Amino acid sequence: YEVHTTHVPPGSSNGVIKVEHFEGLYKFLSQRNVKNMILTGDFNSPKQELMSGEVITWGQKVNSRGKVRIAVNPKWKDECTGERWDLAERNIIENHTDLDLKDVFRSQYGYEKESFSWFTNKGVGRRYDHIFCSSNMRVDNVFYDQEPRTRKISDHSPLIAELG
């Protein structure tokens, strides 16, 4: 087994550093040739996952009519386009199958189940913490343990998984 953990910095305060982190992580993982790999950590992404299975990245915006488009963040526009941001984030969060990895939580529950690992000050839930494993690995159980977050031990709920 090869296990990798990461903490992708939040884009709000780090901008292009977040994008570069995703790009570097994707490049590193695509050069690995390992039968059983696990990638886990705080990815500070995605912005939203819809019940339809559509993933909204931080490189996108949703307008009042629900139409999704590439975002242009004036704060980072000189360093990073919305397209680059979207692709970098999506390559790990959504296109992980290119790396022969599966999202452990989604492999068990699909997009019908909502569960969150972090909440904004306004109470908006986000699923920022992920475990990805090689597609040949079995997922026996997976859940977000809300107790450490609700007891204020951490601002994130850990994702617990039993893999085989």
Regions found by a protein language model. Name each.
Residues Y1-G164:
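Active-site regions of metal-assisted phosphoester/phosphodiester hydrolases
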